[in-house]
Each structure stands twice: as structure tokens, then as C-alpha cells.
A protein has these predicted regions:
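Thiol-based oxidoreductase modules, predominantly thioredoxin-like and allied folds used
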Residues: 52-67, 79-87
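Short active-site neighborhood of thiol/selenol oxidoreductases, capturing the structured segment around
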Residues: 14-50, 56-58
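Short acidic, S/G/P-rich loop/turn micro-motifs used as interaction or catalytic elements
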Residues: 30-34, 65, 220
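A short, polar/charged loop-to-alpha-helix boundary motif
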Residues: 219-240
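Thiol/selenol-based redox catalytic cores and closely related redox-interacting motifs
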Residues: 85-220
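Short, surface-exposed basic-aromatic patches at helix termini and helix-loop junctions that form
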Residues: 48-49, 71-77
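N-terminal "domain-start" segment that seeds a small globular fold
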Residues: 1-19, 38, 42, 233, ...
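Residues lining hydrophobic/aromatic ligand-binding pockets adjacent to catalytic sites
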Residues: 55, 199-200, 229
Length: 241
């Protein structure tokens, strides 16, 4: 299957994203969305393997340059791997899920989605962040320190008391809390306009000839991957060891 024309047209405008190489294109939601943070943080962990495998990465988010600068500084995503649009024009052209659109503006829709309405899997994924998951990799190393605002710091060794090699109880919830503190403390930097806070994203892995090796459309909040326990599982067979 050939990649959508709208996607190929956009990639033609981006240096380094021409055909002749495999390309991973990630359409993030609003930069201030938790999904955007988690997806970027997952991608940062495989950047060397993507490069070694000859896969060019391009993330496209909703926001502005100031938000993109801060987003990349916080998540570690290289700034040249992220471009931003002030409106979800490409998202709409690809018919990605716009989220609930009830009367009263975007906030009622977002709150309903956070409650799992029109956002399948959200509540289960929230719960997984607290309960832990033995099928998922650990998120916080023993020597890592997670900053929660200005004063509170949590050391990874705290989770080490519960074991290692899997996602411990409250571990993912702590990562999400750190992301939330960052977003809420700089809301207007990450979200210049509230109009698109329900918009979801998608993923496209393209072959050298522009055919689609893999694609996924986000179905709801905390649903940026079909396998949230290992969000990049779809990439494993394409990455160098």
C-alpha cells in the first residue's frame, strides 16, 4: 500500500525525508499532551538504533517553535527531528481522530476523553501506570532522579526495592506526573491554543519506495501505540541489534 498523498507531499518539503530510505513519521498530538511526551521519550531511547538501521525519524506536532524548543529540551528529542504546525492540517488530511467534539468547546471533550468516553483504553492505561506491568520494561533507572516540580525529587533506587527488569508499581505514574508538572507549569508555551487539545496522532513507517510498512492511528488519550506496554514493538523487526 502506498503512503497517503498528503503525507508524501509534506515529507517532500522536509530535508532528509525523501524516498530512497526508510522513514518513521510520527504525528504527535498537541505538544502539551501526555501522549506526545511519552512517545518522544520512547523514541529518544532508540535513536542510535534508528540511525544504525537507516531509518530517518521525523515527528510532526501541534504547537509553535517556542513550545517545540522546550519540548525537545525536556524530552531529549533532537530539535531537528521535530517540526510543528499551529493547526492540525496534516492530521485532518490523514483523517486522524479529532477526539470528542461536544458542545461547549474543546475542554468538555477532553475531560470526557480523560474519563474514557470516546477514548478506548484510557482508564486501563492510567491504572497500569499505578499497578505496574511485568510485561513492560522499567522506566526509571536505579541511578536516575525524577524531578517533580521545584522541590520534590524521587530517586530510582526507591523503585529498585520492588525489583528490576520490569515496570514497577507507580513507576510509570511517576514519569507521567513529572511530565504533567512540566506541562502545567508552562501550559501556554506548549499549548498556544486550546482548540486542538482533543486531536490524536498517528504513526507511519515507510519503505524506501514510499509504501507503508506499518501504520497506526491513535484511538484515544494514552493510546499512541497499539502495544502500550512496549510502545515501539512495531519497530523491533526493523531495528539493528
Amino acid at each position: 500500500m502506498q503512503a497517503p498523498a498528503a503525507l508524501l507531499s509534506r515529507l517532500a518539503e522536509i530535508p532528509g525525508m525523501a524516498p530512497g530510505q526508510r522513514r518513521l513519521v510520527v504525528l504527535l498530538s498537541q505538544l502539551g499532551d501526555f501522549d506526545s511526551f511519552e512517545y518522544a521519550q520512547a523514541l529518544v531511547g532508540v535513536l542510535p538504533r534508528l540511525e544504525a538501521s537507516g531509518i530517518a525519524l521525523q515527528a510532526i506536532g501541534i504547537g509553535d517553535d517556542a513550545g517545540a524548543d522546550r519540548f525537545c529540551a525536556f524530552t531529549g528529542l533532537p530539535r531537528n527531528r521535530l517540526i510543528v504546525d499551529d493547526e492540525p492540517i496534516l492530521h485532518r488530511a490523514l483523517d486522524l481522530y479529532g477526539g470528542l467534539q461536544p458542545p461547549g468547546g474543546p475542554w468538555p471533550g477532553l475531560l470526557l476523553m480523560c474519563a474514557g468516553i470516546g477514548s478506548p483504553g484510557t482508564l486501563a492505561e492510567v491504572l497500569r501506570g499505578y499497578s505496574g506491568d511485568r510485561t513492560a520494561a522499567e522506566r526509571i533507572g536505579a541511578d536516575q532522579v525524577v524531578q517533580l516540580g521545584r522541590w520534590l525529587r524521587i530517586r530510582g533506587s526507591l523503585f529498585g526495592r520492588l525489583g528490576s527488569g520490569y515496570q514497577r508499581p507507580f513507576e510509570l505514574a511517576t514519569v507521567r506526573l513529572s511530565n504533567m508538572v512540566e506541562v502545567l507549569g508552562h501550559w501556554r508555551t506548549y499549548v498556544p491554543r486550546d482548540d486542538y487539545i482533543t486531536q490524536r496522532g498517528g504513526t507511519y513507517l515507510l519503505e524506501v519506495d514510499d509504501s507503508v510498512l506499518y501504520s497506526y492511528r491513535d484511538r484515544g488519550i494514552l493510546g499512541f501505540s497499539a502495544t502500550m506496554d512496549r510502545p515501539l514493538r512495531f519497530l523491533e523487526s526493523f531495528l539493528a541489534a
